[in-house]
C-alpha cells in the first residue's frame, strides 16, 4: 500500500511540475508577443496561462498586463475590469493600484482615483507618484489644505523634488496666499536661474495680477532658455492678446504650431 501511495505522490508532483512549466511557457509566449506589439496574441497567451493555473500567485500580474493591453486598444472599461480582478487577487499590489488609479483619473473619475492613491499611500507613505497625483486632485477640487499636506510630505522625503516645489507654489497662489507664492517662486528662480519652467510659472502669476511688463519679461526669458517649448509661446501669445498686441500674439501662435501645438487650438485662441 505504501508503495502505491509513493507512486501516487510521485505522479502528482510530476503533473504539478508539468503544469507549472506549461504556465511559465504561456507567460513567456505572452511577453514575447507583447515585445512584438502582438496584443491579441499576448492576451490569448496570458488568458490561457490563467485558465491552466487559475490559483497561481502570478495571475494578479497577468491581469495587470491584460489591463495595459486593453488600454492600448482604447478599451478602458475592460482595462478597469482587468485591474480590479488583479486587485481582488492581490489587494496590496502597489503597481496594480497605481495603474487603476491612473486609469480612473484619465476617465475623469477623480474621486475613485484619489481613493486608490490614498490606498497606495497607506501601504507606502512616501510613494511619490501617489502623493503627487493625490495632491493634484485635491488642488483641483479646492482642497488646498490637503494638497499642501501632500506636497509637504513629498518635500520631507525629497527636499528638492521639483513637482512638489512647484505644486506648493501653485497651491499657495490659488488659496489666498499670493505673497508667499510669489516669494517661493522667486526663491526658486534665484537658486535655479537657468530653469525655464520657473520663469514661465512666475510669468503666469504676474499675468493674473495684471503685471504685464513683468510677465512679458519672465515669459520671454523662459523662451530664451528653452526655445523649443511650444507651451511658452502659447503663454506669451495669451499675454500679448491681453496687452492688445494681436500681431505679436499671432507670430507666437505660428511658432507654437511649428513646434507641435494644435493649429485648431491656436486659431481658436486668436478669435
Task: Say what each PLM segment does.
Residues 17-65, 72, 271:
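N-terminal leader/linker segments that initiate helical-solenoid repeat arrays
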Residues 23-24, 57-61, 94-95, 128-129, ...:
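Helix-start (N-cap) detector for alpha-helical repeat units in TPR-like alpha-solenoids
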Residues 35-36, 69-72, 106-107, 140-141, ...:
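Register position in tetratricopeptide repeats
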Residues 52-55, 89, 123, 157, ...:
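Structural marker of alpha-solenoid helical repeat scaffolds
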Residues 61-65, 99, 133, 167, ...:
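Canonical tetratricopeptide repeat
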Amino acid at each position: 500500500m505504501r508503495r502505491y501511495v509513493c507512486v501516487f505522490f510521485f505522479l502528482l508532483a510530476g503533473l504539478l511540475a508539468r503544469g507549472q512549466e506549461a504556465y511559465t511557457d504561456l507567460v513567456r509566449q505572452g511577453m514575447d508577443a507583447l515585445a512584438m506589439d502582438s496584443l491579441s496574441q499576448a492576451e490569448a497567451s496570458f488568458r490561457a496561462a490563467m485558465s491552466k493555473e487559475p490559483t497561481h500567485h502570478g495571475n494578479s500580474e497577468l491581469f495587470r498586463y491584460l489591463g495595459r493591453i486593453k488600454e492600448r486598444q482604447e478599451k478602458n472599461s475592460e482595462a478597469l475590469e482587468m485591474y480590479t480582478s488583479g486587485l481582488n487577487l492581490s489587494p496590496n499590489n502597489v503597481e496594480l493600484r497605481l495603474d487603476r488609479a491612473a486609469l480612473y483619473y484619465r476617465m475623469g473619475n477623480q474621486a475613485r482615483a484619489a481613493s486608490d492613491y490614498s490606498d497606495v499611500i497607506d501601504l507606502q507613505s512616501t510613494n511619490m507618484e501617489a502623493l503627487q497625483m493625490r495632491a493634484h486632485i485635491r488642488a483641483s477640487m479646492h482642497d488646498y489644505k490637503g494638497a499642501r499636506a501632500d506636497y509637504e510630505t513629498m518635500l520631507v522625503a525629497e527636499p528638492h523634488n521639483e513637482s512638489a516645489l512647484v505644486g506648493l507654489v501653485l497651491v499657495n497662489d490659488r488659496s489666498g496666499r499670493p505673497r508667499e507664492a510669489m516669494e517661493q517662486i522667486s526663491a526658486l528662480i534665484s537658486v535655479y536661474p537657468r530653469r525655464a519652467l520657473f520663469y514661465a510659472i512666475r510669468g503666469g502669476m504676474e499675468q493674473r495680477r495684471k503685471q504685464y511688463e513683468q510677465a512679458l519679461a519672465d515669459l520671454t526669458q523662459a523662451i530664451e532658455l528653452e526655445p523649443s517649448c511650444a507651451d511658452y509661446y502659447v503663454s506669451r501669445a495669451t499675454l500679448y492678446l491681453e496687452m492688445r498686441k494681436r500681431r505679436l500674439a499671432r507670430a507666437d501662435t505660428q511658432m507654437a504650431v511649428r513646434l507641435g501645438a494644435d493649429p485648431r487650438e491656436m486659431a481658436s485662441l486668436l478669435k
